[in-house]
Design a protein with these regions (language model features):
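Phosphate/Mg2+-binding loops and adjacent switch elements
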Residues: 82-187
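Broad hydrophobic/π-residue packing in well-ordered secondary structure
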Residues: 10, 39, 87, 138, ...
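Generic hydrophobic/packing signal
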Residues: 3, 27, 33, 54, ...
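C-terminal accessory "lid"/substrate-recognition subdomains
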Residues: 156-250
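Short, hinge-like loop/turn segments at secondary-structure boundaries
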Residues: 50-53, 136-138, 194-198
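Compositionally biased, low-hydrophobicity segments enriched in charged and small polar residues
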Residues: 39, 111, 143, 147, ...
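Nucleotide-state-sensitive switch-loop elements of NTP-binding domains
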Residues: 2-8, 13-131
């Protein structure tokens, strides 16, 4: 089984640093392939990669998002066929749309190739400026992430961090947000929290789908709209013909 993760973020946000952290603390026992492009951040030192057992396949054709249906997809398939890695980490260009990269990855998904979590790095000091100046690209990276890791948190005030959190939450209210100093942030804990959140969301989605199908097949509601109700009194059908789901108290 090969898991594909994407680590995105604008230039200088700290993608390379985070990837090194994950390789050392989270994926050290896995066979990993790193795919990056020449317009990304300064490449990770080849000596470090060799010691970590990581292979690099550079995209010489340019930005990863400029050749999604051709060069990138072919290269990705070659990596999987040649190396049979446990994990592939894709570091796309800082100006690439994360949604486009994910679409390209979906082409190679199979029973043996799984899409992992997408992580976006946000420079907490530049968040407001980038949202204003690079809105479309920046918002796309945030919206399509399962986790957002804030960098440079040691150099700004708590108010500045909270401002950035509020801005990101307005775009993505489901992603796991990390505002901890990277010196205190453990790669294993980070990955575990992201996966726990993803499993919870999938479980909730499955439960909602089950409840919806159960409601549809158990009999029609005579109320306008035919929606579920949390209070029997709010339903004109007086409880006949379908179940009413009580609100779960947390």
């Amino acid at each position: 089984m090969t898991v594909i993760n994407i680590v995105s973020g604008f230039l200088g946000a700290g993608k390379t640093t985070l990837i090194k952290k994950l390789l050392q603390e989270s994926f050290q026992n896995e066979k990993v392939v790193l795919i990056e492009n020449e317009f990304g951040e300064i490449g990770i030192d080849s000596g470090f990669l060799k010691d970590a057992g990581v292979d690099i396949k550079e995209m010489n054709s340019g930005c990863i998002c400029c050749s999604l249906t051709g060069d990138f997809t072919i290269a990705l398939k070659e990596v999987i066929d040649q190396y049979h890695p446990d994990r592939i980490i894709i570091e796309p260009s800082g100006v690439g749309k994360l949604s486009d990269v994910k679409k390209a990855v979906e082409v190679v998904l199979s029973e043996q190739v799984k899409m992992g979590e997408a992580i976006t790095i946000v420079d907490v000091a530049k968040c407001k400026t980038y949202l204003k100046n690079f809105g479309e690209f920046y918002k796309d990276q945030v919206i399509h992430s399962q986790a957002v890791v804030f960098s440079r948190v040691d150099f700004v005030s708590e108010d500045k961090i909270q401002e950035a959190v509020d801005q990101i939450r307005a775009l993505n209210d489901e992603a796991v947000l990390f505002t901890t100093s990277w010196d205190l942030l453990n790669g294993n804990q980070m990955v575990d929290l992201i996966q726990q959140k993803e499993n919870l969301l999938k479980s909730l989605e499955a439960e909602m789908k089950h409840n919806h199908e159960h409601h549809e097949h158990h009999g029609g509601c005579c109320c306008s709209g035919g929606a579920d109700h949390t209070e029997k009194e709010a339903c004109n059908c007086k409880g006949d013909g379908h179940h009413h789901h009580d609100e779960q108290k947390s």
